[in-house]
A protein has these predicted regions:
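Catalytic domains that recognize anionic headgroups
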Residues: 1-178
Length: 178
């Protein structure tokens, strides 16, 4: 989040400003461009841009497209009833179960994952808007690589000699976790 703040606000706050929102008193490039008649947009699957504590990242853009389903985004409330165990098992039930573990039961192939959907939405935006604006600024924020490290086939094992049956997508950031 601090890096995004610096990019959009033209600030050098990365090392000093904590993780958080664009403050109401701060100017940002999306607003300045919009005021000059430049078409602006943001396409992102980054859930923290759209949640409490990360607010105001999208509000000054002329349009925004939030690609749902990554990390802690509560995109789905229940597992897909037809889920057959692919792409991988969700985490066990309990307080530590992530919203992503529910969302991912709805993924069937590469095109269902947030990263590829973000890039597809970007290509669609460019196709739809080509030739319609003299100038535009499109900010594309792809959350990966970031936990969960959940890579769809055929990419997951492209550079491995053998399949790792204990594929961990949520690194155990605690002592004696494995």
């Amino acid at each position: 989040m601090p890096a995004r703040h610096d990019i959009l606000c033209g600030a050098w706050d990365f090392l000093w400003k904590p993780w958080g929102s664009i403050e109401l008193w701060e100017s940002n490039i999306a607003h300045a461009m919009k005021m000059k008649g430049i078409a602006t947009g943001i396409i992102s699957d980054h859930p923290h841009l759209f949640e409490t504590g990360g607010e105001n990242y999208h509000t000054d853009f002329g349009m925004w497209d939030y690609v749902r389903g990554h990390e802690g985004d509560p995109w789905r409330l229940r597992d897909d009833p037809s889920w057959a165990g692919t792409p991988a098992l969700p985490a066990a039930e309990g307080w530590f179960r992530h919203a992503y573990d529910t969302s991912r039961t709805w993924f069937r192939d590469e095109t269902d994952y947030p990263g590829p959907r973000t890039m597809s939405a970007t290509a669609d935006w460019l196709d739809r808007n080509a030739g319609h604006h003299d100038r535009f600024f499109l900010f594309v924020d792809e959350f990966d690589p970031h936990e969960p490290f959940d890579t769809p086939e055929p990419w997951a094992y492209r550079y491995h000699d053998q399949r790792d049956e204990d594929l961990l997508i949520w690194p155990p950031y605690m002592k004696d976790a494995i």
